[in-house]
Amino acid sequence: MILQALTAYYEQLLKQGKVEAPGWDSRFKVSYELRLGPDGQLLALNDLRQEVPKGKKTVIAPRELPVPHRVKRASGVAANFLCDNTSYLLGADEKGKPERSRQCFEACAALHHKVLDGVDSPAAKAILAFLDSWEPDTAPTHPLLAEQWADLNNNANLVFGCESPDGAHWLATTDDAIRTAWQSAFDTSDADAETARCLITGKEAGIARIHPAIKGVMGAQAAGAALVSFNAPAFCSYGHEQGANAPVSEYAAFAYTTALNLLLADRNCCQRIGDTTIVCWAENAAPAYSNAMLMFFCGGAEARGVSESDLAAALKALSQGRPVSFLDDKLDPNQNFYVLGISPNAARLSVRFFLHSSFGQFAKNLQDHADRLEITRPAFDKRENLSVWALAQETVNQKSRDKSPSPQLVGDLLRAILTGGPYPATLLNGVTLRIRAEREVTRGRAAILKAYYLRNYPTELNKEVFTVSLNESSNVPYVLGRLFSVLETIQSVANPGINATIKDRYFNSACATPATAFPTLVKLAQKHLQKMTTPNEVHFSKQLTELMAQLPETGFPARLSLPEQGAFEIGYYHQTQKRYAKKNEEE
């Protein structure tokens, strides 16, 4: 299903003229042009790099160009057509293995002769003449190359270019005769390949022995990783070797890898969260869908020129099945949409999740998630929404050296949000541990508690307790949380400027075993009330009386279960935020 969806995406892009036909890589980073004269002499080394924005600064980066399809290299010698590194195009490098460099150059010359012999094109003749006359030993000291030799050997890719006697010049990759010759060679390259019925297209075709590499996954090998590979006998069946174990045609292998590489290279379609790289796309290949989806669950709308209010309005409309105009495009809630999560695993890629639904259904799941997370927030917290990464960070000790949340948690949380399924128990466990360790109920932690219990245990009692702001529920754990917050306030008012409050010493015991903590705290509060002025004493005594009246006659509970502790923490958070809100209004 994954490969079929990616292949269909490639074919849609091909119809729209956004990708090259099979046999060509649409985007490849090229740094320099080797410009040749009609007789094959090297006329110039042209720098193709360009300035691109990176964060708040500008950097020099290679230019992305369409080039002939790249071979997948292992440890052997394998040349690429028209575009390669100095080892192949010039026969020299700084790796200290001159014999291997010469072998690379010879392989390059052999490939170009195989493709271009007999081609009636000045550019083709110039390239062959260059390869026949070039002396690799002269490359490092060549007057046109010496100054840039260090840069040329810094993982730079070069491409052949040509110049006519009248001064006109062009890249060899754009020469019609050369493109035709290469296309013919590529189309017949699998003539000797094993044939079988392709699992993706359903057609009898030559099977790809090794699939092209996937690049751009954070944490994977720089040379690329494989989504489909068989590199040990234990992975093979019925005597098949490598790609024959999962027959995918050369065309389909090219199509799905091209599509995935394009998605990974586009920041509007790709986002990394933890060790998971997420790519998403619409069936019609309109980029606005991917752009909007990443804003919905990863944030960053302001950086893309979209206000939080406009984003929220678009999400709400789509969740209700209404089309909206967004980023100069119309988003249809019925459009098929795909989300793929992948993680690095040595030379392979692991699929964390693959989701397919209508764009409107994804929007509804995200809207429901946002509604469950909604909770009153401190005045200093300006965030309209909490991203997936922000939620995962609430489970991590921010003072530790490694502040990365569990990759498994991030993946499970993403799946739950996008499918509308139950939140992972590890999310609740992580938040509970942080609250116990730090005795702090932040906005993010309170929002997680609220969302978790409303989604995983949608009882009437939970709907009554886990609300956006303070409510008058008589639920005992919730009332106890409110009571603890009031007791803390009484202590702070009676002893202004104290460094530690009852929260630092009693929060965990009050939350888990109220009967052991609250009698002491209530007695302590009476002493604090005596220190106050009469208006404050009356005000807080009234609050204490109202809350104590809602507790059972049997007294404080001996212990609270985990869900009840969640209600306690929400009650504490609600009451505390009401206190701060009132203080801000007075100021």
Q: Can you say where each PLM-predicted feature lies in the sequence?
A:
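Short metal-coordination and nucleic-acid-contact micro-motifs, chiefly zinc-binding Cys/His arrays
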Residues: D190-A196
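Short, solvent-exposed secondary-structure capping/transition elements
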Residues: I207-H211, N268-C269
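Short Cys/His-rich metal-coordination motifs, predominantly Zn2+-binding knuckles/fingers
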Residues: T201-E204
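Conserved phosphate-interacting/catalytic interface
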Residues: M1-D190, F235-E587
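Short microdomains enriched in Cys/His and/or Lys/Arg
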Residues: R209-N245
